[in-house]
Curated annotation (Swiss-Prot):
Location relative to the cell: Cytoplasm
Species of the source: Paracoccus denitrificans (strain Pd 1222)
EC number: 6.1.1.15
Function: Catalyzes the attachment of proline to tRNA(Pro) in a two-step reaction: proline is first activated by ATP to form Pro-AMP and then transferred to the acceptor end of tRNA(Pro).
Protein known as: Proline--tRNA ligase
UniProt-listed Pfam families: HGTP_anticodon (PF03129), tRNA-synt_2b (PF00587)
Entry's family note: Belongs to the class-II aminoacyl-tRNA synthetase family. ProS type 2 subfamily.
GO cellular component: cytosol
Quaternary structure and interacting proteins, as annotated: Homodimer.
Lineage: Bacteria, Pseudomonadati, Pseudomonadota, Alphaproteobacteria, Rhodobacterales
InterPro entries: aa-tRNA-synt_IIb, aa-tRNA-synth_II, aa-tRNA-synth_II/BPL/LPL, Anticodon-bd, Anticodon-bd_dom_sf, Pro-tRNA-ligase_IIa, Pro-tRNA-synth_IIa_bac-type, Pro-tRNA_synthetase
Gene that encodes it: proS
UniProt cross-references to PROSITE patterns, sorted A to Z: AA_TRNA_LIGASE_II
Length: 450
């Protein structure tokens, strides 16, 4: 993409309304525009990152054997009355009447609707296990929306639901989701720690929240520092292997890690003092096992092996897709701007032309741009007639992991400069070598999607 033709309304000054880093940088980089309290338009740069995150979510859900679908944003209030949850959400739930005076609501979650779909079409235990998910916009009428996309009223969320014949099968689904989420977050360049949590209005016998450590986090967290040394890495997982999924869950949850809601001071004190940590965290996902909480009142049953009807065991699993952008920025930035991890960056590399209008630099940039594209690399080419300092400032603000700088002095020796946004280190090499090096850097990102 040529920057001269791109819509990226960058701001020079910090917006006064932004209280935290991610909100400030997303506004300054032209990623979002506020339309109402807690409601945002996603401008091209922000939308591009949002879609990269969503794509990783879809890939990892497919890898775990989960099936994508799409449910509407508006739901019938009758389903929520049937489950007994219609009043639980209070004023957070946006209630609507259509022209026929029927009660509708803008869904904050989808347990009722997915249970209704299941009971309408699944009748036998032979159709189990089943896990369905979708990625859809949600609305919760927060009393005090703030912090940009971190605590908005409208947000994009992946929510999935498993249906199993027995508690044992449902707990395997729980473990499978925990493993899948660990891999999902790591691909995004995040370390999201699974922590024992409270079920809230969704309920559940077992639940873990995934939190990213950040000073601006809304939750106080208590954990054993050894957990931050754990990495999912490139391990291969057979999601049908009960023992393997259970082993990964135990590896990542056996050490103490809890939110303030479930914190046990006595247990925490048993950890060696040098390993005790108290910090703040941003919730980016949560998984639940809630047994027959919804299936029993809503009649979601199947014919079991003995011919009798039994309620299915269920769980739900959510990832805050739009919130993840804020969490990534909170975890990865400096005083000049965003530092995107390679897995979610809107563009793989930026090209800066130091002498726009010069035949040699223009030609070299065009050739470099074409070759990067041929190698499957998405480049943002700053071809504007601007000062070099302004171009560097824009690239630093936007936070692409790599920058190629092209100038007449370097080209005289067939050299360009490849710079890491994270470390600031620069290396001179030929344009061809820069393309090869970038392809090597991004190959693990491409491989992870396979």
């Amino acid at each position: 993409m040529r920057l001269s033709r791109y819509f990226m309304p960058v701001l020079k000054e910090d917006p006064k309304e932004a209280q935290i880093v991610s909100h400030r940088l997303m506004l300054r980089a032209g990623m979002i525009k506020q339309q109402a309290a807690g409601i945002y338009s996603w401008l091209p740069l922000g939308y591009k990152v949002l879609r990269r995150i969503e794509q990783i979510v879809h890939e990892e859900q497919a890898r775990a054997g989960h099936i994508a679908m799409l449910m509407p944003t508006l739901q019938s209030a009758d389903l929520w009355r049937e489950s007994g949850r219609y009043d639980d959400y209070g004023e957070e739930m946006l209630r609507i009447k259509d022209r026929h005076k029927r009660d509708l609501l803008y869904g904050p979650t989808n347990e009722e609707m997915i249970t209704d779909i299941f009971r309408s079409h699944v009748n036998s235990y032979k159709d189990l296990p089943l896990t369905l998910y979708h990625v859809q916009w949600k609305f919760r009428d927060e009393i005090r929306p703030r912090f940009g996309v971190m605590r908005g009223r409208e947000f994009l969320m992946k929510d999935g639901y498993n249906f199993d014949l027995t508690k044992e099968d449902a707990l395997h689904a729980y473990n499978r989701h925990l493993v899948s989420y660990l891999r999902t977050y790591e691909r995004m360049g995040l370390q999201a720690i699974p922590m024992r949590a409270d079920g809230g209005p969704i309920g559940g016998d077992y639940t873990h929240e995934f939190l990213v450590l950040a000073e601006t986090g809304e939750s106080e967290v208590f954990y054993d520092s050894e957990i931050t040394d754990l990495k999912f890495g490139d391990r291969r997982i057979d999601y049908d292997d009960v023992a393997q999924c259970r082993a990964v869950l135990e590896e990542f949850t056996s050490r103490y890690a809890r939110t303030d809601e479930t914190h046990d001071a006595a247990l925490f004190e048993q950890i060696p003092k040098e390993r005790r940590r108290v910090a703040r965290g941003i919730e980016v996902g949560q998984i639940f096992y809630f047994g027959t909480k919804y299936s029993e009142p809503m009649g979601a049953t199947v014919v079991g092996p003995d011919g009798s009807r039994v309620p299915v065991h269920m769980g739900s699993h959510g990832i805050g897709v739009s919130r993840l952008l804020g969490a990534i920025i909170e975890a990865s930035h400096d005083d000049r701007g965003i530092i995107w991890p390679e897995g979610v960056t809107p563009f793989h590399v930026g090209i800066v032309n130091l002498k726009q209008g010069d035949a040699s630099t223009d030609g070299a940039c065009e050739a470099l741009y074409a070759e990067l594209k041929a190698q499957g690399l998405d480049a943002l080419y700053d071809d504007r007639d601007e000062r070099a300092g302004a171009k560097f400032a824009t690239m630093d603000l936007v936070g692409l992991p790599w920058r190629i700088t092209v100038g007449p002095r370097g080209l005289a020796a067939n050299k360009v400069e490849l710079t890491s946004r994270r470390t600031g280190e620069s290396v001179e090499m030929s344009p061809q070598e820069a393309v090869v090096r970038l392809r090597e850097i991004y190959q693990p990102v491409f491989d992870a999607a396979k």
